[in-house]
Amino acid sequence: MEFNMKKEAGFTTNFPYGELHIAGDEEYGFRPYQLMVSSIAVCSGGVLRKILEKKRIAFSDLRIQADVTRNDEKAGRIEKIHLHYIITGEDLPLDKIEKSIELARKNCSMLQSVINSIEVTETFKIK
């Protein structure tokens, strides 16, 4: 990856999908902590989706709410991320959903990358 400084503020980088703008100021791009939280949430959600599909658990939607706790005394360090999955479907087996979330946690590379430095917790709700 290569990051190029923007004249006004922040940096850009290019990926096959498109150009990504990153900056400490939301006027100029995504903030680094937003990208980190998004990476963890979407990685774990994507892994969970694959696990549910592989187990043939029929669901119609999966949403993730992420609550972030930051420590302003330590440069805004991310201390905790709570992921709340909202899974829509009929007659979803709660025990299999719980086990699938545990499996997703073990197989999400982004979550595993921060496991010893950021507390990550998960809950879910069936809708």
Language-model regions, residue ranges each:
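Extended beta-strand/beta-hairpin segments
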Residues: 1-38, 46-127
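Alpha-helical metal-binding/catalytic segments enriched in His/Glu/Asp
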Residues: 43
